[in-house]
Amino acid sequence: MSITNTTRQLNRRDFMKLAGGLTAGLAFTSSSFVSRVHAQTTSGRRDDELNILCWEGYNTEEVLGPFRKAFRGIKLKAESGTDDPSMINKLRAGELKVWDLINLNQCWAREQMWPEKLIVPLNQERFLPHLEKMLPYFYDKKNGVNPFALSPDGKDLLGMIQRFGPFSFVVNTKKISRATAEDQGFPLFLDPKLKNRYGVLAYDNWNVMHLCFTAGFSPFKTHTPEEVELFRKTAQQLFANAKMISGDLVQLNQALVNGDIDCYFSGGNYTASTARHEGFSEVRGISPLRGPVDGKGAMQWFELTSLVNNPDLSPRAADFLEFVQKPEICKAVAFAEGTFNPVSQMAQPGVFAKFSKQELDAIQWDSLEEEMSRSVDYQVVPDNDLLTSIYNEAKRTRT
């Protein structure tokens, strides 16, 4: 039995890589598309047009096709990016008039796009009822909406939540038990016994944050000279002792299954899901029990889809946000072309019923709630440029 080579997944969380090719069948060249949009823009309402800048999954026919049927004649375009900052830079570079929706990881809306007036708030009367039906991590009666979906003052709703998941590291539980991996956490990779027995999934931005966890301090602060030096030594050791480094999660999952490695650095439910779906349940995303960020040693991500501050915003943008709340569309987003993730709407019986036992096992539903509870949100790293330069040097010069 071999693992399907689903190449579309390879750059899903590789925030530092350059934007790659666009999804087959829905692909278009960004520069030419931008030119066409500017040429076609009028002062009238764009009822028959919608342009979406997103992570892969939302740009698939499983998601877009039903929306086209619901809004006959709509000119619907979706471009997938491979890192959040590059997508934000499109808006900064003058493409506010191009895009209607932007789909990014949780920290960017309130920390950058909202202060820079790149997005506008959602109608709370329309969208809060949908949020109130989500899993408790994203809405509960006591605390309300997850703060990453709100403006810093808590008054404005900045986007809708859907896909999410823990993201720390992955092990073969036939070689390293789940209990051992959760107990040891990221320092597991510094054990001399693991030399040449692990891989590194080269998702650079995640690697930088996870190296901070490995070194024993939070990524989400400006670091002291002593911490920077410890980061350097930790990065050097990680790369020097790794058996393989690859941006291809399928290759790393295959190495786990074949016994070439016992675990890989940076990964989670998302990267393990396709292997698990094909029957390799020993491939498991791990969320450590403890760590340096308020006692937590694991991380998670979720996406927020926001309305762009387009001066001629399409009214179909808000319609799309509501459309993807439908149970069948929630399922399509969750399992779009091999991109296997849980979605926040799975608290609803009608959505949950769409998932088979095999699919629930693929996304590690059995432990998802507890793993999310001990995971910290992905956030902006203040001195990311410095740490990334050290990281890149350690990777380049590994011996």
Locate each region found by the language model.
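A structural signal for short loop-to-beta-strand junctions that line the ligand-binding cleft
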Residues: K97-I102, V120-V170, R197
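Early extracytoplasmic/lumenal segment of secretory-pathway proteins
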Residues: A39-Q112
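N-terminal secretory signal peptides
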Residues: M1-D14, S35-H38
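Ligand-binding "clamshell"
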Residues: M113-L122, G154-D156, T274-R290
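Ligand-binding pocket segment of bilobal, Venus flytrap-like solute-binding proteins
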Residues: G199-Y203, N207-L211, P219-S287
